[in-house]
Amino acid sequence: ILVTALRLFAVYGYEAVSVSRIAGELGITKGALYKHYKNKRDIFNCIFEYVCQLDVERSRKSGVPEQDYSDMPEAFSHVLPKSLGDYMKAQFHYWSEDEIACNFRKMLTLEQYKSSEMSALYQKVLVSGPLEYIERLLCEMSKRQKKQLPSPHALAIEFYSPFYLLLSMSD
């Protein structure tokens, strides 16, 4: 159900897809779909939770904090540059090759222009969120190495921009 709904959201946009359309695509009735999910928003929330869960797993596997700095500042002070590189590679493969991640990203890209909520989510997941995360990691790495970075924000932009560009080109 989630994969089918997300595929439809990625092609037509979240707002344009009805529960009836999802049920029709699956060959089931709306009533059968409502036995699993309360509504379309519930389906979206389950998709988002799954995407977040996978992000936590990739973070742990790569040795980087799985939450924001405000939630676990101590974890940011122990990250190695290699761990950040490994994480970014894993992120690129995930966001460019995984069917769920690709469709989630495509849906957010479409919906960011139609809804302030989706625009904020797009920023958090794909633009300002990763940028702030990388900036915080770079700041903590420089503290540990006792080196002052001229502009952690500018360095984070330089680090993240190729990732974002290549991700956009992968479509």
Regions found by a protein language model. Give the residues of each.
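Solvent-exposed, amphipathic alpha-helical segments
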Residues: 4-12, 90, 104-107, 162-169
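Hydrophobic/aromatic-rich alpha-helical bundle segments in the mid-to-C-terminal region
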Residues: 120-124, 128, 142-171
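Amphipathic alpha-helical packing segments from all-alpha helical-bundle domains
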Residues: 82, 96-109, 113-143
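Short amphipathic alpha-helical interaction/hinge segments
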Residues: 55-59, 99, 116, 163-171
